[in-house]
Regions:
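Secretory targeting and sorting signals
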Residues: 1-45, 383-400
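Protease zymogen maturation seam
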Residues: 3-6, 39-97
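C-terminal region of N-terminal signal peptides and the immediate post-cleavage residues
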Residues: 31-51, 359, 368-378, 397-408
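Subtilisin-like serine protease catalytic core
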Residues: 88-100, 107-118, 124-170, 263-266, ...
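Loop/turn elements at helix/coil->beta-strand transitions in domains of secreted/extracellular proteins
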Residues: 96-100, 153-156, 183-189, 211-216, ...
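Substrate-binding/access-modulating region of protease and related hydrolase catalytic domains
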Residues: 164-232, 286, 293
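Extracellular S/T/G-rich loop segment that most often corresponds to the catalytic His/Ser-adjacent loop
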Residues: 234-307, 311
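C-terminal subdomain of the subtilisin-like protease fold in secreted/lumenal serine endopeptidases
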Residues: 309-401, 412-418
Length: 418
């Protein structure tokens, strides 16, 4: 019995087999194409040390105890130091001669890392947050510790602001603190914790600071039990509004915040603000996070630039820091990152007018994009190889069909080979 098969169906099945073979080959040689990998800056280091550190926060309940900070010290250099390229930056400037005012409830000025750096500090810090901010800005090197501030040559003036038991700082208190900071001669004013509401007095204090050529740096948001809210005075265009990014450079915020006016909350820059190792009251190290911590890094970067170029105005310093930041993949319109990640070395290595100076630094590390990134050369090789394999599979199928049709005999003169 001879079975007759529809030639059209046979050809269709063969074409399907060829396509399946090609698809399988493509999947085998290019598994990475199905899931782009997020780019991660090579300079980032894990913040985890060999010991568990106390985490400090900008706020606490009035009936909660003070932060219990031990005397453990991390010997490794924190990830933030590598991420910001501070070793190279300190070859150009340490912030010597620049006064930075830190608005916080308390700062323990007696810790070894802040010895000789702090004016107006207290002997204790219930929250521990103010001491960590001062350390981010200007901690000096201490033997056995890998921690050093962004501007270890700068001086810190502590301006007590907010309730020492809770950390809450209303707009009126911040306004008074900014006024006191400007009166002390500070060129940089760091607002440690923002207010969730503005006020006419706060607007006036910010205007007075700009008139006195002092740069106000403040957190973009204020944390609450209901989630983050837009911070004040960060919504003022003359204030450098800073948001936190994590160890891979991506913004910590999950989405933009909207003001009552319908406008998006302002963000000018991002800086490290997640799992940051800092100085704690008593001399031990702590872990902290948030936009206030990120603002402290930017305040330190401003001090570095002011010390290197003392003739720059506060507005020019602000513009330089924003224009030299590692920009977001979405550009300046990114509602979470603003101008991008602060780059202290880039800000100092860029001469007025935008001409880069010849300063050796760390290799460029592109910001991570939420859409991922693909290694272009490797991808090109994989794609070309995959296409070649597909072509060979198709041609092989055609030759196979012709050979079977001829019974595998040699082609007669003039008979097509394919």
């Amino acid at each position: 019995v001879t079975a007759h098969t529809d030639p059209g169906r046979v050809r269709a099945r063969r074409r399907a087999a060829v396509r399946a073979t090609a698809a399988l080959a493509l999947a085998l040689v290019s598994p990475g194409l199905t899931a782009p990998v997020l780019a991660a800056p090579a300079a980032a280091r894990s913040p985890d040390g060999p010991v568990a550190l106390t985490q400090v926060h900008p706020f606490k309940g009035g009936d909660q105890p003070c932060a219990a900070v031990g005397d453990d010290v991390v010997e490794q250099t924190p990830w933030t130091h590598h991420f910001l390229g501070l070793s190279d930056a300190h070859e150009l400037s340490t912030g010597q001669g620049v006064r930075v005012a830190v608005l916080a409830t308390e700062v323990d000025g007696g810790v070894p890392a802040l010895a000789g750096a702090v004016e107006g500090g207290q002997s204790a810090d219930c929250l521990g947050f103010g001491t960590s901010l001062a350390g981010v800005v200007a901690a000096r090197h201490v033997e056995g510790s890998g921690l050093v501030g962004v501007a270890p040559g700068a001086s810190v003036t502590v301006v007590p602001t907010g309730d020492t038991g809770t950390g809450l700082a209303p707009a009126q208190a911040i306004a008074a603190g900014i006024g006191n900071a400007v009166g002390s001669g500070a060129r940089v004013v760091l607002v440690g914790t923002a207010a969730w509401e503005g006020s006419a007095a706060l607007d006036a204090a910010v205007a007075d600071a700009a008139e006195a050529d002092a740069l106000v740096v403040a957190p973009a948001t204020v944390p609450t039990t209901q989630g983050p809210l837009p911070g004040h005075p960060s919504q003022d265009p003359s204030v450098l509004s800073v948001a936190a990014h994590g160890v891979e450079g991506a913004p910590v915020a999950q989405g933009p915040l909207v003001l009552p006016t319908g406008d998006l909350a302002r963000v000018d820059l991002t800086a490290p603000g997640d799992r940051v190792v800092g100085t704690g009251p008593g001399g031990g190290h702590v872990v902290t996070a948030g936009d206030g911590v990120a603002a402290a890094f930017v305040a330190g970067a401003a001090a570095l630039l002011m010390a290197r170029e003392p003739d720059l105005t506060a507005a020019q310093v602000r513009e330089r820091l924003v224009s030299t930041a590692y920009s977001s993949p979405l550009g300046d319109a990114d509602p979470l990152a603003g101008g991008g990640r602060v780059d202290p070395l880039g800000a100092m290595a860029t001469a007025p007018g935008g001409t880069a100076a010849g300063v050796a630094g760390e290799g460029f590390v592109p910001d991570p994009s939420p859409h991922g990134s693909v290694d272009a050369p490797a991808t090109a090789v994989v794609v070309c190889g995959s296409l070649l394999l597909i072509v060979l599979c198709v041609l092989g199928g055609a030759v196979l069909r012709r050979g079977r049709a001829r019974g595998w005999r040699p082609a007669a003169p003039g008979e097509p080979l394919s």
